[in-house]
Design a protein with these regions (language model features):
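Structural motif
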Residues: 161-163
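C-terminal nucleotide
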Residues: 2-151, 165-186
């Protein structure tokens, strides 16, 4: 109870981290944009990431996985990559670091810093991984203007669907109504 899981998909492990559900609530805002992952766009991004990791491995053979890669390594091989491949790799490396930092922020009870990680994650998904859409960006942007929303980002594979928002418990209903009204009016 009052925990979230930090999943390690490389080693198939999980860790429980304390999470103050009595103070915050996780709320999903649905963009009502249907994502069609079968069109191959997400698979293209995955392939671009694998291509980039392969280029990094050639120069740095000790780097077996993205979690071993650094931004310094990526900058060394940047000119050997297509710009889109570089952007995907940059997002992946930064997202791994955000995940580690975010887990530490939660362990230390720093919800504000964790929320900033959520917003940074969305920016990376939007600008580097290119899986957001205007509707998701609108929902995250509107949430970022509300003090009682600690953080927000798209969730899932992107290209539509929902945002996940970390909202102070006492303000959930009011904020949900505000966001719904603004979204319907746009």
């Amino acid at each position: 109870k009052e925990t979230i899981l930090l999943l390690d998909c490389l080693h198939i492990e999980s860790k429980k981290i304390k999470f103050p559900l009595s103070k915050f609530q996780i709320v999903l805002f649905n963009s009502n944009v249907k994502h069609a992952l079968e069109d191959g766009a997400y698979n293209t991004r995955r392939a671009q990431g694998e291509e980039g990791l392969s280029i990094i491995k050639k120069k740095f053979p000790q780097t077996l996985h993205f979690r071993d890669a650094t931004m310094e390594q990526l900058s060394v091989v940047k000119n050997e990559m297509h710009q889109d491949v570089y952007k995907r790799c940059k997002f992946i490396i930064e997202e791994i670091e955000r995940t580690k930092s975010g887990a530490n922020y939660l362990k230390n009870g720093n919800i504000a810093a964790f929320g900033k990680c959520m917003y940074a994650s969305h920016a990376g998904l939007r600008d580097l991984y290119n899986v957001s859409c205007p509707e998701l960006d609108f929902l995250v942007e509107e949430s970022s203007n509300i003090r009682e929303v600690a953080g927000a980002r798209l969730m899932g594979g992107g290209f539509g669907g929902c945002t996940i928002n970390l909202i102070e418990q006492d303000h959930v209903a009011q904020i949900a109504e505000t966001i719904l009204h603004k979204y319907a009016a746009k």
